[in-house]
């Protein structure tokens, strides 16, 4: 269904005055969240990135267009403030328990058509970092961390991964961390230069006429 219709309806159904979610920086998600926020109080929080698109800027306060410069500033900010990857503990004393008198029927995954897959999800393998610098680019070798899909769908926190690798001191760690920085850079580009999602990063190149139409 359409989340702009379903989210407000579900909030009303369960008696929720506010909806809390994590930020998404793709153009579709931004439009979706704006539409939802017009119907229900929507609170969005940074989660999928370490540093938001507006937290890393050049000396003039403008977003970076080149990755290396972005990465250098990103690493310097992390070095000076480890709160970017800090852990947050929930104060359970402030959370009130309230038993709902309204019974809500929620369909199971089986009821809505999902079937159990025989595919096994691989664990995230941080042990590969020791040889990551030398072996990461060889498809025949099983030497990737397998973290990509977990990060993409929010199954694991990018902060927890960085906290785990910070004590490591080798070239593999530097490259793997650089690839996580690239994720933030990618989202920064999406947020600051939304035209790049479907057009050339530099708009003037959209006018190039390709002889083979590709």
List each model region and its residues.
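Acidic/His metal-coordination segments adjacent to aromatic residues that form catalytic metal sites
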Residues: 209-214
């Amino acid at each position: 269904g359409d989340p702009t219709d379903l989210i407000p309806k579900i909030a009303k159904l369960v008696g929720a005055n506010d909806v809390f979610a994590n930020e998404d920086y793709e153009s579709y998600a931004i439009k979706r969240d704006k539409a939802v926020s017009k119907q229900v109080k929507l609170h969005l929080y940074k989660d999928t990135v370490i540093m938001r698109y507006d937290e890393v800027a050049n000396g003039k306060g403008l977003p970076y267009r080149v990755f290396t410069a972005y990465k250098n500033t990103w690493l310097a900010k992390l070095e000076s403030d480890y709160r970017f990857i800090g852990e947050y503990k929930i104060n359970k004393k402030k959370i009130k328990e309230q038993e709902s008198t309204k019974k809500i029927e929620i369909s199971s995954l089986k009821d809505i058509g999902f079937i159990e897959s025989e595919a096994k999800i691989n664990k995230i393998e941080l042990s590969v970092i020791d040889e990551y610098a030398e072996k990461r680019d060889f498809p025949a070798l099983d030497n990737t961390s397998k973290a990509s899909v977990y990060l993409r769908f929010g199954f694991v926190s990018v902060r927890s991964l960085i906290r785990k690798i910070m004590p490591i001191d080798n070239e593999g760690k530097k490259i793997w961390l650089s690839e996580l920085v690239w994720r933030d850079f990618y989202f920064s580009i999406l947020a600051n230069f939304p035209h790049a999602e479907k057009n050339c990063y530099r708009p003037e190149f959209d006018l190039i006429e390709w002889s083979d139409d590709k």
